[in-house]
Swiss-Prot record:
GO terms for biological process: mitochondrial electron transport, ubiquinol to cytochrome c. The gene is MT-CYB. Keywords: Electron transport, Heme, Iron, Membrane, Metal-binding, Mitochondrion, Mitochondrion inner membrane, Respiratory chain, Transmembrane, Transmembrane helix, Transport, Ubiquinone. The chain crosses the membrane at residues 33-53, 77-98, 113-133, 178-198, 226-246, 288-308, 320-340, 347-367. It comes from Dactylomys boliviensis (Bolivian bamboo rat). This is Cytochrome b.
């Protein structure tokens, strides 16, 4: 009699995905982030569901309802901070996951990579709308500034903005629809994650060497289940430290002031995980140019498979490309820092230089370096 795990229509899908899946024997801790992102998504959906039970999507009561959750609901403070800081962990892991993909050439799995980029857009949209819901000062003004960017679209822009707002400014209608979208998007993301995994399992996982590993595979369980559980424990430790010791470390103090359309905060800025893109947006004086640069700064990820000119897949044996990749990381850290600074000298110039460097490294230097390395190896 065949094992139920291998014959049952539903259980065998789980079996082929997480138990009997043949995995490369040499994948490092950089391959842990996929499972960590899955855990983060589950955590966000569960905590979000409990928050939605007590939250009211109305401009007059939204801020008070969040305060009520923190003060009066049993462990409400824990749920709220787990959700807020869980989002930060989500983005840390997302950026590590994408960085891993760039470093080890995982983007050559075209379908998996492109679904991944769409997932990034969906997660960014969800996080942005979630930031609006507490209806603090930064929520309101962040929503106003970011939605206003759409007015840069020629001809239909201003109409589009008013259509999204549901009026002539960010108000009750905007908050209600943002809550609706913020609730539904994580489920759409979950479906997209399944497609992401479906495409990944068509090809099998990449590995640090970038070479075909068909000749040396090991079962996912117990080897990588144990490894993933260890990663989850480390994540739980970091997240609990953040929630219990400094829950507001990554937040903005302005969001503890209720939204006031008559009083603009001195420095409007998004959450830390959007600062790099915000810095690129601000570095271009023209409104439409800034919006295009902002969108392209993420969309550029889709060009990676086309820009891969090296004869080797991974950067493991390409020291020159490795240097560029780490320069790109440093550049993104600089952009993140600049995004949080006021628009004044010398930050404007640094931001413009860092933005130019970002596009130059990806579009010009990395492909050139790949060709140079091919020449050095006489390929």
């Amino acid at each position: 009699m065949t094992n139920m795990r291998k014959s049952h229509p539903l259980i065998k899908i789980i079996n082929h995905s997480f138990i009997d899946l043949p995995a490369p024997s040499n994948i490092s801790a950089w391959w842990n982030f996929g499972s960590l992102l899955g855990v983060c998504l589950a955590l966000q959906i569960i905590t979000g569901l409990f928050l939605a039970m007590h939250y009211t999507a109305d401009t007059t009561t939204a801020f008070s309802s969040v305060t009520h959750i923190c003060r009066d609901v049993n462990y409400g403070w824990l749920i709220r901070y787990a959700h807020a800081n869980g989002a930060s962990m989500f983005f840390i892991f997302l950026y590590f996951h994408i960085g891993r993909g760039i470093y080890y050439g995982s983007y050559t799995f075209m379908e998996t990579w492109n679904i991944g980029v769409l997932l990034l857009f969906a997660v960014m949209a969800t996080a942005f709308m979630g930031y609006v819901l507490p209806w603090g000062q930064m929520s309101f003004w962040g929503a106003t500034v970011i939605t206003n960017l759409l007015s840069a679209i020629p001809y239909i822009g201003p109409t589009l903005v008013e259509w999204i707002w549901g009026g002539f400014s960010v108000d009750k209608a905007t908050l209600t629809r943002f809550f609706a979208f913020h609730f539904i998007l994580p489920f759409i993301i979950t479906a997209m994650v399944m497609i992401h995994l479906l495409f990944l399992h068509e090809t099998g996982s990449n590995n640090p060497s970038g070479l075909n590993s068909d000749s040396d595979k090991i079962p996912f369980h117990p080897y990588y289940t144990i490894k993933d559980i260890l990663g989850v424990l480390f994540m739980a430790l970091a997240l609990l430290m953040l929630i219990l010791f400094s829950p507001d470390l990554l937040g903005d103090p302005d969001n503890y002031t209720p939204a006031n359309p008559l009083n603009t905060p001195p420095h409007i800025k998004p959450e830390w995980y959007f600062l790099f893109a915000y810095a690129i947006l601000r570095s271009i004086p023209n409104k439409l140019g800034g919006v295009l640069a902002l969108v392209f700064s993420i969309l550029i990820l889709m060009l990676f498979p086309s820009l891969h000119l090296s004869k080797q897949r991974s950067m493991s044996f390409r020291p020159l490309s490795q240097c560029l990749x780490w320069i790109l990381v440093a550049n993104l850290i600089i952009l993140t820092w600049i995004g949080g600074q006021p628009v004044e000298h010398p930050f404007i110039t640094i931001g413009q230089l860092a933005s130019i460097s970002y596009f130059c490294i990806i579009l010009i230097l990395m492909p050139t370096m790949s060709l140079t390395e091919n020449k050095l190896l006489k390929w």
